[in-house]
UniProtKB/Swiss-Prot annotation:
Domain of life: Bacteria
Catalytic activity, reaction form: L-glutamyl-tRNA(Gln) + L-glutamine + ATP + H2O = L-glutaminyl-tRNA(Gln) + L-glutamate + ADP + phosphate + H(+)
Organism: Geobacillus kaustophilus (strain HTA426)
Record note on quaternary structure: Heterotrimer of A, B and C subunits.
GO biological process: translation
Family: Belongs to the amidase family. GatA subfamily.
Cellular component annotations (GO), alphabetically ordered: glutamyl-tRNA(Gln) amidotransferase complex
Record-linked PANTHER family: GLUTAMYL-TRNA(GLN) AMIDOTRANSFERASE SUBUNIT A, TRANSAMIDASE
Keywords, ordered alphabetically: ATP-binding, Ligase, Nucleotide-binding, Protein biosynthesis
Name this polypeptide is given: Glutamyl-tRNA(Gln) amidotransferase subunit A
C-alpha cells in the first residue's frame, strides 16, 4: 500500500502521531516517480533538491508542535502554467523553455504558507490549448489506465500524476474543461471553482475571462482541503471576488435528502457514448437512493457554446500571447535580420501549431471587418448561455451530466482533425462561459476506462457541489480503483 492511498486527513494524522515523517512522504513521491515516470511522463521539471531540504525543515517544525494545517508537509504537483519562483515555468512551450520566474503565483504563496512541498512542474498542452496534452512542446503524457491513450488536457500531467500515485494532489487550470476532462479520463477528482473564487495572479493567461485554477485529487474531501487553502480575494487580481470563503470540509455531511437535481437533455443526447450515458444514469439512481430527486431540463443555448467559446477564448489568447515576442524573456530567434523579422521568426519558431491556429482565429475574430459578426455576437450568445444556467438554478440545486462524451481516446486518434478534438470539451465549456463551479468525480468504467460525472453548482456554491460529490463518492467505490502500472 502506498502512503498516497491515504487521504489528506489520514496523512495529517500519521504525521501528527509521528508514524511517518514529511521526508518519508517526499521520498515516497520521488520513489514512485522513479518507478513509473518513464511510462507516464507527467513531469516536465522536478524540484527534488529543494523539496528534500524543505521536508527536513518542516519535519523540525513538526517536532516542535508548531503546525496543525491539514496540508502541512504534503507533496504537491503544479501545472506548468502557474509561476513558481526559482523553478522553471514553461507552459509546455519552446518559447518559454528557459523561463525562470522571479515571483510566486498567489496560489503558490498560499500553498507555501500552508506548508505544502512542490515536487515538480507538470506537463500540459502548450499554453493550456488542447484536450489531450498532445500539444505539449516537450513530451507526450500517457493515461495511467491505458498507456496507449491520452490523459486528457490541458492539465493532463496533473491528472496523470495523481492517478499514477506520483503525488497525492496537484493544481491544474481550467479554461474550457482543462481540469475536469483530464480528471474524468484519469479517474480522479477535479474541480473548476467559480470564476473569481481563486486568484489568477501568476497564472500565465490563455483566456482571462475564462481561466480558473483548481485542485485535482484522489477524493472529494482532499479536493475541499486544497480549495480551502487557495481560495479567497487577492489584491493582485482584480477579478478575484471579495466573498467570504466557507469551510468546505464541513459541507461534506453526506446528507442530500430533498436535493433537486437538473439533468439537461442536451448533455445525454447525440454524441454521448452509450456506456457513458448508462454510467451517468446509474449515478443518478445512486443519488436518488440517497434522497435526491432529478428531472430533465433544457439548456437550449448549449449547442452554441463550442463556437462561442472558441471565438472568445481565441480572441483573448491572441491578445494575451502578444507579449511573447523575444524581447523581454523566453526564446529569441538567432535568424533575424531586423526587429520585425525577430518578432515574426521568434513566434513562428517558438509556438506550436495549435497555439498558432488559435492566435490566427482570435486575430481574425477581432479584426475590424469581422468584430461585430464574430466577437461581439459571441459575447451576446455567452450572455444567453449564462441566462440558461440562471433560469435552471432558480428551481434546482445542482446540474448533473457526464463530464465528457466518451472515455479517453487513443493517442493520435484526433490530432489530424482539430474539430473532433474541440468536440471533446462540448460538455465542459458551457460551465466556463457561465462562470459557475463544477466538479468531475469518477462514476464508472467503460471497457476498463474511467467515466466522469460532472456536478455543476450556483455561483460561489462550491459547498453544495462538494456535498453532492462526496455523498456519491461515499456511496460507491470508484474513487478507490487504481490503475496498474
Amino acid at each position: 500500500m502506498s502512503l498516497f492511498d491515504h487521504s489528506v486527513s489520514e496523512l495529517h494524522t500519521l504525521l501528527k502521531k509521528k508514524e511517518v515523517s514529511i521526508s518519508d512522504l517526499v521520498d515516497e513521491s520521488y520513489r514512485r516517480i522513479d518507478e513509473v515516470e518513464e511510462k507516464v511522463q507527467a513531469f516536465l521539471t522536478l524540484n527534488e533538491e529543494q523539496a528534500r531540504a524543505k521536508a527536513k525543515e518542516l519535519d523540525n517544525q513538526l517536532a516542535k508542535g508548531e503546525e496543525t494545517n491539514p496540508l502541512f508537509g504534503l507533496p504537491i504537483g503544479i501545472k506548468d502554467n502557474i509561476v513558481t519562483k526559482g523553478l522553471r515555468t514553461t507552459c509546455a512551450s519552446k518559447i518559454l523553455y528557459n523561463f525562470d520566474p522571479i515571483y510566486d503565483a498567489t496560489v503558490m504563496e498560499r500553498l507555501n504558507a500552508a506548508g505544502t512541498i512542490t515536487i515538480g512542474k507538470l506537463n500540459m498542452d502548450e499554453f493550456a490549448m488542447g484536450s489531450s496534452t498532445e500539444n505539449s512542446g516537450f513530451q507526450l503524457t500517457r493515461n495511467p489506465w491505458d498507456l496507449e491513450r491520452v490523459p486528457g488536457g490541458s492539465s493532463g500531467g496533473s491528472a496523470a500524476a495523481v492517478a499514477a500515485g506520483e503525488v497525492p494532489f496537484a493544481l491544474g487550470s481550467d479554461t474550457g474543461g482543462s481540469i475536469r476532462q483530464p480528471a474524468a479520463f484519469c479517474g480522479v477528482v477535479g474541480l473548476k471553482p467559480t470564476y473569481g473564487r481563486v486568484s489568477r495572479f501568476g497564472l500565465v493567461a490563455f483566456a482571462s475571462s475564462l481561466d480558473q485554477i483548481g485542485p485535482i485529487t484522489r477524493t472529494v474531501e482532499d479536493n475541499a482541503y486544497v480549495l480551502q487553502a487557495i481560495a479567497g480575494v487577492d489584491p493582485m487580481d482584480s477579478t478575484s471576488a471579495n466573498i467570504p470563503v466557507p469551510n468546505y470540509v464541513e459541507a461534506l455531511t453526506g446528507d442530500i435528502k430533498g436535493l433537486k437535481i437538473a439533468v439537461p437533455k442536451e448533455y445525454l443526447g447525440e454524441g454521448v457514448d452509450e456506456g457513458v450515458r448508462q454510467s451517468v444514469l446509474a449515478a443518478l439512481a445512486v443519488l436518488e437512493k440517497l434522497g435526491a430527486a432529478w428531472e430533465e431540463v433544457s439548456l437550449p443555448h448549449s449547442k452554441y457554446a463550442l463556437a462561442t467559446y472558441y471565438l472568445l477564448a481565441s480572441s483573448e489568447a491572441s491578445a494575451n500571447l502578444a507579449r511573447f515576442d523575444g524581447v523581454r524573456y523566453g526564446y529569441r530567434t538567432d535568424n533575424a535580420k531586423n526587429l520585425i523579422d525577430m518578432y515574426k521568426l521568434t513566434r513562428s519558431e517558438g509556438f506550436g501549431a495549435e497555439v498558432k491556429r488559435r492566435i490566427m482565429l482570435g486575430t481574425f475574430a477581432l479584426s475590424s471587418g469581422y468584430y461585430d459578426a464574430y466577437y461581439k455576437k459571441a459575447q451576446k450568445v455567452r450572455t444567453l448561455i449564462k441566462r440558461d444556467f440562471e433560469n435552471v438554478f432558480e428551481r434546482y440545486d445542482v446540474i448533473i451530466g457526464p463530464t465528457t462524451p466518451t472515455p479517453a481516446f487513443k493517442i493520435g486518434e484526433k490530432t489530424s482533425d482539430p474539430l473532433t478534438m474541440y468536440m471533446n470539451d462540448i460538455l465542459t465549456i458551457p460551465v466556463n462561459l457561465a462562470g459557475v463551479p463544477a466538479i468531475s468525480v469518477p462514476c464508472g468504467f467503460v471497457d476498463g476506462l474511467p467515466v466522469g460525472l460532472q456536478i455543476i453548482g450556483k455561483h460561489f456554491d462550491e459547498s453544495t457541489v462538494y456535498r453532492v460529490a462526496h455523498a456519491f463518492e461515499q456511496a460507491t467505490d470508484y474513487h478507490k480503483q487504481k490503475p496498474v502500472l
